[in-house]
Each structure stands twice: as structure tokens, then as C-alpha cells.
Amino acid sequence: MKKVAIVGIRGYSGLELFRIFYYHPEVEVTKIYATSHYGEKLSEHFPQLEGLTDLTISEFNEEEIMAECDAVFFATSAGVSQKLALTFIDNNFPVIDLSGDFRLADLEIYNKWYKNTNLKNEYLLSGQYNLADIGQAKANYIANPGCYATATLLALYPLVKNKMIDLDSIIVDAKSGLSGAGKGLSDASHFVNVVDNMSMYKINSHQHIPEIAQQLKIWNSNFQALQFSTSLIPVSRGIFVSSYAKVAADFDFETIKNAYEQVYATKNFVRIRRQMPHLSDVIGTNFCDIGLAYNPVTNVLSVVSVIDNLMKGAAGQAVQNFNQLFGYDESLGLKFMPSL
């Protein structure tokens, strides 16, 4: 039985981690940390946990974590783990980081997109960015992919890796539920401004753009850039990504469909659907559902991918990475059915 700590327990992703591990047969959450409410029971803040846990919130203590736990999860906003995780890196202690602090390998690019960082390059390079359905977690510092990046990369991987599309033609239209913005209050997330509405935000400036570009470049060195837009939709959770690209010469739709089937045939959490997927099909699960369509008039392939931003886009994939790192079946504790 592995013991783990969660830093950022009062956030959406932190609480989702706790929910997953409650059902994980090989893990016990023994330490939970937040920036306030020390000594108070978690169930005092989340009444739905009454009778399920007696854990109390503690002030962050890296020495305590390394002495009493086998791994630590950072379910924190950008800028936190780059300060608090350095001791763990120095001691080669297992960390799964759900934030964007260690996802980019280039310090100059990191500073451009995340701003105001004092992170040193040697620390930035210490982590392994691991898209769990494509790679294998091996390093003791795992940078968990972002929600938009996860849905986009899983949609594009077979195409980019196998050179099936014109790389200069990639357009991605990504939509997120409100929990993707975290718990911070703003006009953009105010109920009155969100309900019965849809709005675009961070056009051409979302921090997941360089993360996506970095990985696509690894898969195909000829990749240069993509057009990526993000919108908020009035649902509590979920990511709905529509990706478009021109099909390269010598490839037909059947060949492309077969490529997706072959790439993901052995993957536990990627499902290639015969029809276009619905967002509700994946809510509460670690699945990514993908649907394909081809327009022969324009020679454009449409790829729709849907995930739960708090599961596959955050906590679910983090546990999948943890399972890989510690030698468990990667699906252990993650076989949730979609909620109705």
C-alpha cells in the first residue's frame, strides 16, 4: 500500500484526486495540504465527505511528506510547484505535478507564456512530460499534461506522427467547462455571464499552445505552428475539441481511420467512436473519445475529441501516470463509468 500526499486539496483537481484514491486498492491518502484552514477536517469544507474521511488539512511541510509518504501530488495553480517542489527534485522524491510549471522544456518559451518566473533551467529540465496514453512514466518528476493539450494531442497524434496531414493547415477549436478555470472568482466565470452563453478567451495566447506545439514538434520535426482558439461553455466540466487539417496526398479516409484504430487499439482510455462523440459520454471518467469525419470537397479532416477536464485532463491522468511510475496496471482505480 502506497501512501500519498495531496497539495492543493481544496481545489477541484485536488478533491478529484482524493475521490479517485478513495477507491484505489493500492493507495492511501495520508496527508492533505492547503494554504489555510489548518487543523480543520476536510469534511467541514466538503460535507459530501462526512463519514468517509477524518483527514485534517495541514500546512505544507516537505520534510513531513518525504518522511511519511511515497509520493506527492501538486494540484496547484501555476507558480506554486516551481517554488515548493524543488526540495523534492533535489531529493529525487516522486512528484506528480498537475500544474503547468514543468511542462515546457525551453526556459525562454516558459517565461514568455507563464510570466514572472524565477525557475532555473536545470529544474525545468528535471521533469518528464508524459501524455499517459502515448508515453510511459519513468522519471520521479512527472509533469502532467494540461486539459486542452491532452484532448488536442490525442486527437492529432496519429495524423502528425504518420505524416497524414498538411502540418501548416492545423486549426483547433477548443471549448471548456467552467471548472477548467479553477475556483478563482471573476466576471468571466460569474453565473449570470456564463449561463445560456458562450464566449472566447485567451485567443492566440492560451498557455497550452506552446505545450501542444512542443509535443507535435517531437512527433514530427517539420511541424511549425497551429491555430488554436479557446471558449467557455456553460457546463461544469468537460473539454470539447474540434480539430481540422488538410489531408496529405496519398492518404484516404479509410487509411486514416485504420491508423487511429491501430494506434489506440491497446490503449485503456482512448475510444475511437463510429459516430461523433458526446461530451456526456466521458464525464466522470478517464476516457478520451474520438470521432472522425472527412469532407472530400475541401479535403479537410475533422477530428472531435472529448474528455472530462478534471479526470483525463487532470486528476485521472495524474493517477494513470502514478500507476505507470509505480508499476501498477495503469487502469487501477480508474475504471469509472460515465455519470448519467
Swiss-Prot record:
NCBIfam families: argC (TIGR01850)
Pfam families (alphabetical): Semialdhyde_dh (PF01118), Semialdhyde_dhC_1 (PF22698)
Classification via PANTHER family: N-ACETYL-GAMMA-GLUTAMYL-PHOSPHATE REDUCTASE, CHLOROPLASTIC-RELATED, N-ACETYL-GAMMA-GLUTAMYL-PHOSPHATE REDUCTASE, CHLOROPLASTIC-RELATED-RELATED
Species this chain originates from: Lactococcus lactis subsp. lactis (strain IL1403) (Streptococcus lactis)
Name of the featured protein: N-acetyl-gamma-glutamyl-phosphate reductase
PROSITE patterns: ARGC
Catalytic residues (positions): C147
Role description: Catalyzes the NADPH-dependent reduction of N-acetyl-5-glutamyl phosphate to yield N-acetyl-L-glutamate 5-semialdehyde.
SMART domains, alphabetized: Semialdhyde_dh (SM00859)
